A protein has these predicted regions:
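Short Cys/His-rich zinc-binding micro-motifs
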Residues: 1-3, 49, 150-156
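Intrinsic disorder/low-complexity detector
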Residues: 20-42, 99-120, 124-126, 170-178
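Ferredoxin-like iron-sulfur electron-transfer modules
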Residues: 31-51, 63-84, 98-105, 109, ...
Length: 178
């Protein structure tokens, strides 16, 4: 989180004594996630939140609602919004589940995106998408996922996964558009 050439590593972590011990569970999404039943859709939520807030949408009255309140409505328009919001979650926290139990995932090309959060005036994590494997320091692979966020600030309690600690830490890599 202190590189002078962010988002690239310049070795500063060694000079600062950074301890990057991995603390994230290697349990699968299915093992971590709770099931939330709507009227006509089911959403799986594993609580790994990077605080990107794509799970919120503005309703017809101009008020912000979250995916959980929209899911409870259960009408066609709401179901469409729930699918969109769940698919937009870069952390992969939220997934709509089909009637057969399959997680409905968006088709994403492999890539890694540096995320900034101008609304909170902080730099966020790395959005990894398109089923890019994640290997732990000991060589064990995490479950292959379509979407996840990696910590960049170095302060996550779920390393290497982003847990939104960058927000209270006011992490700034020097590239936030203000």
């Amino acid at each position: 989180g202190h590189s002078s050439s962010a988002p690239f590593c310049d070795g500063t972590h060694k000079k600062r004594g950074f301890v990057g011990a991995e603390t994230a569970s290697t349990d699968t999404f299915d093992q971590r996630a709770e099931t939330i039943e709507g009227k006509s859709l089911t959403v799986r939520d594993d609580k790994r939140c990077a605080f990107v807030r794509f799970c919120h949408a503005e309703n017809a009255q101009g008020e912000r609602e979250n995916i959980w309140s929209i899911l409870a409505k259960g009408d066609v328009a709401s179901d469409s919004t729930v699918r969109e919001l769940a698919s937009a979650c870069p952390a992969g926290r939220l997934n709509v589940q089909s009637e057969s139990g399959e997680l409905l995932e968006p088709e994403l090309k492999p890539g890694i995106t540096v995320v900034q959060d101008p609304e909170q005036a902080v730099s966020a994590g790395l959005y990894v998408h398109g089923y890019i494997p994640l290997e732990s320091a000991d060589g064990e692979e995490y479950e292959l996922r379509n979407r996840y966020m990696l910590c960049r600030c170095g302060l996550s309690r779920e390393k290497p996964i982003c847990d939104a600690t960058h927000v209270p830490a006011a992490f700034d890599d020097g590239h936030i558009e203000k």
